A protein has these predicted regions:
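Outer membrane beta-barrel
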Residues: 74-95, 105-245, 251-253, 260-267, ...
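Outer-membrane beta-barrel "beta-signal"
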Residues: 404-418
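N-terminal periplasmic/intermembrane-space "pro-region" immediately following the signal or transit peptide
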Residues: 3-86
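Detector for outer-membrane/organellar transmembrane beta-barrel domains
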Residues: 250, 255-364, 376-377
Length: 418
């Protein structure tokens, strides 16, 4: 800023004589315009430098989980606040061959928003390699014409980042969930996502109701998280969410942690989550996940294996194993992706598993815009009731799927990043 004042003073001094020729006046105006332009560039570079030195490690979690979509640089204001967002909507034809209400259509066409969002984030350097960080992100629904377009809090936090790592409080994806993101082809809120099976247990539908279905792909509210610095590719994360309604007999707090390693060719993650007293006091729900991926050129192939255990109303524990194979490849502007997930039986109860696969093709028109198409199929065993269609059958309230259903979906949509 001092340099700007000096330059303007020099220009003014030379401009003191009253009778300038027209050409000299024009030259003076050009110089003043150049100074203003240079000053704006200096401000922009200063904010970029501050963002690089003080940006939170949360950038990895903010990244689009669809690894096929081209990256887009978010907009940064002069005050250092970054605006960013994603609009993802598609036209779908979905089918469920078994629904619980005879008046419910087994197939429908619909328009869906898939975790579209808008966010603000920023940081402030506090000196001594310390920075304050914050983020506010909400989910929006451009397909919802009958209600509010704003329908939920996404990853939002406030905290500190420094040489010690990153610590924050707020609402955020658990380390267990984040460990899987490297393989995810879609946002979790989509009929095409692998998280309709991976990370989930089935309810025990084999002649009793001791077990409630559990989902470990969670964005945890009221959470305290710590992320270690990245040490030559290694990073640890830990999250703790207290139980504000704790009683003398039950404490439903949640603990989630992970260790990851990543370089130009490999990605590996080991994650664990524990949820005590969820169904019955003194019985824990817990999950362990192992993820590995190999990166090559424009592609990635990977696998996830997990062991999930849930408490029952009889104060026992039942477990199941899930497996996922996934891959994606970028060829020019085209993006190809596919995955297969197999969920095992719950405990010793037969026919409580399911499998699912999805095929995806996308085309990047620019770094902001992708057009995509996808097909998915989920097949339940005779006593299982997993669903890509949430708790209701293809959007019809009150008409849930029944055991043993097969669900399919075909869609074409567009993603715009800003």
């Amino acid at each position: 800023m001092q340099k700007k004042i000096i330059v303007l003073a020099l220009i003014s001094a030379f401009a003191a004589p009253a009778a300038f020729a027209d050409t000299e006046k024009a030259e003076l105006e050009k110089l003043r315009a150049m100074v203003q332009e240079l000053d704006q560039k200096i401000r922009t570079l200063e904010h970029k430098l501050e963002s690089k030195t003080a940006a939170p490690a949360q950038a990895n979690a903010n990244a689009n989980t669809n690894t096929n979509t081209a990256a887009s640089a978010p907009a940064t204001t002069a005050s250092g606040i970054t605006f960013y967002g994603r609009v993802n909507a598609d036209f779908e034809s979905v089918k469920n061959d078994k629904v619980s209400a005879v008046t419910t259509a087994k197939s429908v066409n619909r328009v869906q928003s898939n975790a579209s969002r808008f966010g603000l984030k920023g940081s402030e350097g506090l000196g001594d390699d310390l920075a304050a960080i914050w983020q506010l992100e909400i989910q929006v629904d451009p397909a919802n014409g009958g209600g509010t377009p704003f329908n939920g809090t996404r990853n939002s936090n406030v905290g500190l980042k420094g040489g010690f790592g990153t610590v924050f409080v707020g609402t955020w994806d658990t380390p267990y969930k984040l460990a899987h993101n490297k393989l995810e082809l879609f946002d979790n809120a989509s009929i095409f996502s692998a998280t309709n099976l991976i990370g989930r247990t089935g309810a025990n539908n084999a002649a009793n109701t001791l077990v409630t279905a559990v989902n470990y792909n969670t964005r945890q509210s009221s959470v305290l998280q710590y992320w270690s610095p990245n040490l030559s590719g290694f990073q640890g994360m830990i999250a703790y969410s207290p139980d504000s309604g704790q009683t003398t007999t039950q404490n439903k707090s949640k603990l989630s942690l992970s260790g990851t390693y990543e370089n130009d060719m490999l990605y590996g993650a080991l994650a664990y989550e524990n949820r005590p007293d969820q169904t019955t006091a003194a019985v824990d729900d817990h999950a362990t996940r192992l993820v590995g991926a190999y990166k090559f050129g424009g592609g990635l192939i990977g696998m996830a294996y997990e062991r999930l255990s849930v408490g029952t109303a009889a104060a026992t524990t039942e477990s199941q194993s899930n497996l996922e194979l996934a891959g994606n490849y970028k060829l020019g502007n085209s993006n190809l992706g596919a995955f297969y997930v197999k969920n095992g039986n719950l405990g010793a109860r037969a026919n409580t598993g399911a499998d699912m696969y999805t095929l995806r093709y996308g085309y990047n028109f620019s770094k902001h815009t992708e057009l995509y198409g996808a097909y998915t199929r989920l097949s339940n065993d005779a006593s299982a009731n997993y669903s890509t269609l949430t708790a209701t059958a293809i959007g019809t309230v009150g008409a849930a799927s029944t055991n043993g259903s097969t669900q399919t979906g075909l869609g074409i949509g567009m993603i715009y990043l800003f």
